[in-house]
């Protein structure tokens, strides 16, 4: 130890550079490991990462020459015809989220509002992902099938609009359309990229389902 301290004292600049370089290398390794863990390990609400298959894009070829190729996200017709009927799957859910077009969530009097990211999904979503509900619960299968405008909101949205997380049964607006709040969940980490949103509503409330016709969406 004394010899090491003596060497550091003899060439302070080189010693500082060596120490900082070693510390930076260790920090970079730690960051890489942390990013790998948060993108692969299971944690709430994405507790089933290790046994979940994600289908995010589909490729289509031209019928005649097989040369015209296109890639896009899945359309609802393809999900209904090919994914929902899968017998080997414990649960199948469809998620439609426009990360580039958040909606304005507001109180009924319009005095409080918050730009929020919306996830359009189905009832199986709440089986695949495990959320911590502070009050209420997910929208029911009957509400989903009927296209009733129910919404599950995050704790931060509830606090921003109402000042409390005990808001089940109250109403709010999403881009001036009224929704009934059926559940409030703890805020979700953005690292849970598939489950993350700030408001979750049935995709059946949209006239077009949020998808194009056919296999593309």
Regions inferred by a protein language model and the residue ranges of each:
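A short amphipathic helical element positioned immediately N-terminal to and/or at the very start
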Residues: 1-9, 78, 82
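Solvent-exposed, non-transmembrane alpha-helical starts
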Residues: 65-76, 111-116, 145-149, 188-200, ...
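Short, strongly hydrophobic transmembrane alpha-helices
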Residues: 7, 11-41
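Mid-to-C-terminal secondary-structure elements
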Residues: 122-139, 149-217
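Membrane-proximal extracellular/periplasmic loop immediately following the first transmembrane helix
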Residues: 32-104, 112, 215-217
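Short strand-coil-strand connectors
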Residues: 103-110, 175-177
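Short, conserved clusters of charged catalytic residues that mark active-site
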Residues: 15, 34, 38, 73-81, ...
């Amino acid at each position: 130890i004394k010899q090491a301290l003596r060497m550091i004292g003899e060439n302070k600049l080189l010693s500082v550079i060596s120490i900082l370089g070693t510390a930076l290398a260790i920090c970079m390794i730690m960051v890489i490991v942390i990013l790998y863990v948060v993108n692969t390990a299971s944690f709430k609400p994405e507790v089933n990462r290790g046994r979940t298959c994600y289908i995010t894009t589909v490729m289509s070829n031209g019928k005649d020459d097989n040369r015209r190729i296109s890639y896009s996200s899945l359309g609802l017709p393809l999900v209904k015809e090919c994914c929902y009927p899968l017998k080997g799957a414990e649960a199948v859910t469809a998620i439609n989220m426009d990360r580039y077009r958040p909606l304005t969530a507001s109180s009924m009097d319009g005095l409080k509002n918050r730009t929020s990211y919306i996830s359009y999904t189905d009832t199986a979503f709440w089986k695949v992902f495990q959320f911590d509900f502070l009050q209420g619960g997910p929208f029911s299968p009957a509400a989903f099938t009927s296209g009733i405008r129910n919404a599950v909101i995050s704790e931060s949205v509830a606090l921003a609009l109402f000042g409390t997380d005990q808001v089940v049964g109250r109403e709010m607006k999403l881009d001036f359309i009224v929704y009934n709040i059926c559940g409030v969940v703890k805020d979700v980490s953005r690292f849970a990229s598939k489950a993350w949103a700030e408001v979750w509503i049935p995709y059946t409330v949209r006239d077009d389902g949020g998808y194009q016709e056919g296999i593309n969406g």
